[in-house]
């Protein structure tokens, strides 16, 4: 309530004190002065509200008659606050408490009322209502929020400054109670409030109106796009909707947050009663919700400060929120809160890029075809809040296939400017793993890759824009072509070329400048492409997807602009295209991990490139997708999945690398000699291994960044792989040619140095592979953890040519679910080491068990009846037999003294000497044992423990 202290306030204060100091008896309560009556009615109002709505209504009716009186009391109360010393005020509080006790209310209620007042605004049950009332009060002036009266009351605040000696509790008990209860009054009370507000000076009114208008405009702009978010409803409510427009809880949070905001925003003193109350509590209790809302309200402060810039951000953010609602309604609120918080924070850090959590459910395969132009514009708008991107762009972003949305990493400010220049910059920059694993957006790669519009700066910048060439990954049912065009910063961009694979002619290959220096890895996925899980850097292709991305066989050195022609076998065109690939920026891999923007990422690419990227349906992301993420891959059209065998070529190492976020750096360490890649690629071998190897290599590097966003299932896979690795020698995985199960022997081969057919002798990269493999092991990543899900499709018909034997099918992810159903694959994987698919391995164990059982049945022990029938049980007697006598004689003849042992027999099972009268059993072979000992043996094995003669072979002679 905004009441102005009148000139006769001191008199009223004295009168009021008199009333408080000379309370009448309870019996005379009806004759109380109007002021006291008003207090009583107010208290009853509040308590009744706490008790029940009906009581509240009744109390409201009772209090109608005393509106004017209440206004007087409020004036007096305010005055007393102004002039009274802390002692006088505390006295007043005591008297006031006594008055309240006169009411037929229990002390308990009294305490509760005071606690309500004292408690922080958020905890007060009426606080929200108070705000609601204030908003209603402000309704005449279309001011947007309760704060709106930042309340130009600086003059008023100065009129009655609160003495510092004033105790917080006294203030809270005095004014807040009035405030709360008065605000609880029915709407008709608003007239009174309005009348009071009319007393404001003209200057104050003008100031308030300006602020209100400003806030209203900004609030409308800000929340126009948020139809039903609680935050929008809150602000809308404060701006123009009546309190009923939003739930009381919302009001409560908003009002608390906004009031506090006002307190902070207008320290000069324009403080409203609400603000004062909040201030009074030095450490207001803030609920979690309130904190969140405070943060969100900070955005309101930001609006005032930032002005229109905020709008572009808000517009962008809201579409994202809507999109979030569509893709995962469960998280929409959470996302919205996050977005708003990030917005608030950003102005402080001058980071133009918003932290956007565009995480998409992996399970959601839906992909919205979007023209690359739209996609590009979106990322740009997101990247730089400065760019006033049109809302359509943001909408397109929200429209982006729910399944894949790139996460926009924070982009260094220097690059941002460039990005802003070209609104069409590819989303490659956006792809960097800035935050939680987010599904990368599927840009429509072919249709129109906007040329690299960014200023040459970006290319010249120290950081190569690996994504300068928009990587194009075409998710064709059978092959993903990832065209990664990355121009080395210094290296001239390779000329744009048509991608025959692309259904739509690609515009100049020049990739939009990806402002992100090291993290610039953008992947364009064909709109029709299957859902892509860029977060894993893997394109999740359903069905047989050959991942052939030819990566430039550029030595790791980012500087090397060596161009290697890659033969891309296009499944669609079936013609192999030779692409000249510029050296790709080293940052291509680093992109995933901003920290390691070093070119090293590119280095690793070839290491496993030798293996053709597998058409991994789900996990190719690691091996093949990486390049998509790293975008650094050269543009060469991805070879269409050549014959299944080629697809079969699995970069065993690659997958495991992907799991390691840090692997990028590790990969960089051993730059595989590009020469072999080139050689492999150079010969358009049907094997396509060359291309696949290349693609794999870059995949590998890319995979490393990908690892950052491993999904839960991937994590599980990795854990499983690690477990298997510990249990079994990891090296075995690659060595065995799948086709020969007998080679399953764990020690067959020595590791990745697989026995490669001569054709693969070009395997020089195996050295790098080993290093990568070792690195992976060190990092605790199993070799291809997820790597090659896709290969199953091809493997199904795959008859591995000898040259492919070196492929470590074992490198395939253990978890690849698709492969479980393919018996061929199981057969092949049967030769793999522990890293091989769990299912195949499990099957092997089962088979072994069954075989053992079958064999065991043959060797199974004899039944007790057979034992009794075929053996001779008796009591042992130390009667030397003729045989013994002869033996002793023979010994003596030899001049050897017969020792006592010569005459004693031992049970060879228990190794104890047979004693007279012991139960013994003689087997058909005439060997003698304790019955107990030999029976146990024969139950499991029918053969004599000494001579291995089956007891069934001959009947006992002594029976």
Curated annotation (Swiss-Prot):
GO CC terms, sorted: cytoplasm; nucleus; PML body
Residue spans of biased composition, Pro residues class: 633-646
Domain of life: Eukaryota
Regulation affecting activity: Binds free ubiquitin non-covalently via its RING-type zinc finger. Ubiquitin-binding leads to enhance the E3 ubiquitin-protein ligase activity by stabilizing the ubiquitin-conjugating enzyme E2 (donor ubiquitin) in the 'closed' conformation and activating ubiquitin transfer.
Enzyme class: transferase
Record bears the keyword Zinc-finger: yes
EC number: 2.3.2.27
Subunit architecture: Monomer.
Residues noted as binding Zn(2+) in the record, renumbered to the chain: 907, 910, 930, 933
UniProt-listed InterPro entries: RNF111_N, Znf_RING, Znf_RING/FYVE/PHD, ZNRF3_Arkadia_E3_ligases
Single GO BP term: ubiquitin-dependent protein catabolic process
Low complexity composition bias: residue spans: 112-131, 228-246
Main location: nucleus
First and last residues of each zinc finger (RING-type): 907-948
Summary of the function given for this chain in its UniProt record: E3 ubiquitin-protein ligase required for mesoderm patterning during embryonic development. Acts as an enhancer of the transcriptional responses of the smad2/smad3 effectors, which are activated downstream of BMP. Acts by mediating ubiquitination and degradation of SMAD inhibitors such as smad7, inducing their proteasomal degradation and thereby enhancing the transcriptional activity of TGF-beta and BMP. Specifically binds polysumoylated chains via SUMO interaction motifs (SIMs) and mediates ubiquitination of sumoylated substrates.
PROSITE patterns: ZF_RING_2 (PS50089)
Location in or out of the cell: Nucleus; Cytoplasm; Nucleus, PML body
Keywords, alphabetical: Cytoplasm, Developmental protein, DNA damage, DNA repair, Isopeptide bond, Metal-binding, Nucleus, Transferase, Ubl conjugation pathway, Zinc, Zinc-finger
Stretch list, region Disordered: 51-171, 189-212, 225-271, 318-341, 370-399, 475-499, 615-649, 661-680
Compositional bias ranges of the Basic residues kind: 475-487
Record-given protein name: E3 ubiquitin-protein ligase arkadia-B
One Gene Ontology MF term: SMAD binding
SMART domains given in the database record: RING
């Amino acid at each position: 309530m905004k009441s102005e202290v009148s000139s006769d306030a001191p008199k009223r204060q004295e009168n009021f004190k008199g009333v408080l100091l000379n309370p009448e008896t309870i019996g005379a309560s009806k004759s109380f002065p109007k002021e006291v009556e008003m207090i009583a009615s107010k208290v009853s109002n509040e308590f009744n509200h706490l008790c029940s709505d009906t009581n509240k209504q009744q109390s409201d009716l009772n209090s109608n008659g005393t509106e004017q009186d209440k206004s007087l009391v409020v004036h007096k109360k305010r005055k007393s606050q102004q002039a009274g010393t802390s002692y006088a005020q505390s006295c007043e509080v005591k008297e006031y408490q006594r008055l309240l006790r006169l009411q037929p209310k229990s002390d308990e209620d009294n305490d509760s009322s005071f606690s309500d007042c004292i408690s922080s605004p958020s905890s007060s049950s009426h606080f929200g209502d108070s705000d609601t009332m204030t908003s209603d009060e402000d309704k005449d002036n279309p001011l947007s929020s309760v704060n709106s009266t930042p309340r130009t009351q600086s003059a008023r605040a100065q009129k009655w400054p609160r003495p510092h000696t004033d105790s917080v509790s006294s203030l809270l008990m005095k004014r807040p109670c009035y405030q709360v209860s008065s605000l609880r009054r029915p709407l008709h009370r608003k007239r009174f409030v309005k009348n009071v507000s009319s007393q404001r000076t003209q200057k104050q009114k003008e100031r308030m109106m300006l602020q209100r208008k400003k806030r209203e405009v900004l609030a409308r702009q800000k929340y126009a796009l948020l139809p039903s978010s609680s935050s929008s409803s809150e602000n809308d409510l404060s701006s123009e909707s009546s309190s009923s427009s939003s739930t009381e809880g919302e009001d409560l949070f908003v009002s608390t947050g906004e009031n506090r905001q006002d307190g902070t925003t207008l320290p000069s003193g324009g403080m409203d009663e609400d603000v004062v109350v909040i201030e009074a509590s030095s450490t207001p209790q803030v609920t979690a919700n309130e904190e969140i809302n405070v943060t969100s309200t900070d955005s309101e402060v930001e609006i005032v400060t930032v002005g229109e810039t905020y709008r572009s951000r808000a517009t962008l953010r809201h579409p994202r929120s809507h999109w979030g609602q569509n893709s995962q309604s469960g998280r929409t609120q959470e996302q919205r809160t996050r977005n708003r918080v990030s917005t608030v924070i950003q102005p402080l850090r001058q980071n133009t890029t918003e932290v956007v959590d565009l995480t998409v459910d992996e399970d959601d395969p839906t992909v919205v075809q979007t023209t690359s132009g739209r996609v590009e514009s979106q990322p740009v708008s997101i990247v730089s809040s400065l760019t006033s991107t049109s809302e359509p762009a943001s909408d397109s972003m929200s429209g982006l296939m729910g399944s894949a949305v790139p996460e926009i990493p924070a982009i260094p400010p220097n690059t941002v400017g460039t990005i802003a220049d070209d609104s069409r910059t590819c989303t490659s920059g956006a792809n960097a793993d800035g935050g939680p694993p987010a599904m990368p957006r599927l840009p429509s790669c072919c249709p129109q890759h906007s040329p690299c519009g960014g200023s040459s700066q970006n290319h010249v910048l120290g950081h190569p824009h690996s994504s300068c060439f928009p990587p194009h990954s075409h998710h064709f049912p059978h092959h993903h072509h990832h065209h990664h065009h990355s121009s080395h910063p210094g290296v001239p961009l390779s000329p744009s070329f048509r991608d025959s694979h692309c259904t739509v002619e690609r515009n100049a290959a020049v990739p939009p400048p990806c402002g992100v220096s090291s993290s610039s890895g953008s992947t364009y996925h064909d709109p029709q492409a299957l859902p892509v899980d860029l977060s894993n850097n893997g394109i999740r292709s359903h069905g047989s997807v050959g991942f052939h991305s030819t990566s430039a066989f550029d030595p790791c050195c980012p500087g090397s602009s060596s161009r290697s022609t890659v033969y891309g076998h296009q499944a669609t065109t079936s013609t192999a295209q030779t692409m000249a690939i510029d050296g790709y920026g080293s940052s291509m891999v680093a992109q995933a991990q901003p920290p390691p923007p070093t070119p090293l990422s590119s280095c690793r690419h070839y290491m496993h490139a030798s293996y053709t990227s597998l058409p991994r349906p789900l996990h190719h992301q690691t091996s093949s997708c990486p390049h998509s993420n790293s975008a650094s891959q050269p543009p060469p059209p991805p070879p269409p999945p050549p014959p299944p065998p080629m697809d079969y070529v699995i970069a065993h190492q690659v997958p495991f690398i992907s799991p390691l976020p840090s692997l990028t750096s590790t990969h960089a360490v051993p730059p595989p000699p590009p020469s072999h890649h080139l050689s492999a690629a150079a010969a358009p071998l049907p094997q396509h291994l060359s291309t696949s190897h290349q693609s794999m290599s870059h995949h590998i590097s890319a995979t490393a960044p990908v690892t950052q966003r491993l999904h839960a299932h991937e994590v599980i896979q990795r854990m499983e792989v690690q477990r298997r690795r510990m249990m079994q020698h990891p090296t075995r995985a690659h060595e065995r040619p799948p086709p020969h199960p007998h080679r399953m022997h764990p020690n067959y081969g020595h590791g990745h140095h697989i026995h490669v057919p001569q054709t693969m002798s070009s395997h020089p990269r195996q050295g790098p592979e080993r290093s990568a493999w070792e690195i992976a092991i060190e990092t605790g990543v199993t070799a291809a953890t997820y790597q090659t899900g896709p290969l199953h499709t091809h493997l199904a018909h795959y008859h591995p040519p000898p040259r492919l034997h070196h492929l470590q099918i074992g490198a395939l992810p253990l978890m690849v679910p698709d492969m479980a159903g393919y018996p061929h694959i199981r057969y092949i994987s049967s030769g793999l080491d522990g890293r091989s698919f769990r299912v195949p391995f499990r099957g092997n164990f089962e088979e072994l068990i069954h075989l053992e059982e079958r064999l065991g049945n043959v060797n199974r022990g004899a039944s007790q009846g057979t034992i009794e029938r075929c053996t001779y049980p008796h009591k042992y007697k130390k009667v030397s037999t003729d045989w013994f006598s002869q033996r002793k004689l023979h010994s003596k003849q030899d001049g050897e003294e017969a020792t006592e042992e010569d005459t004693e027999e031992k049970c060879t099972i228990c190794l104890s000497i047979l004693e007279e009268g012991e139960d013994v059993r003689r087997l058909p072979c005439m060997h003698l044992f304790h019955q107990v000992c030999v029976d146990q043996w024969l139950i499991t094995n029918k053969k004599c423990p000494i001579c291995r003669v089956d007891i069934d072979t001959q009947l006992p002679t002594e029976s």
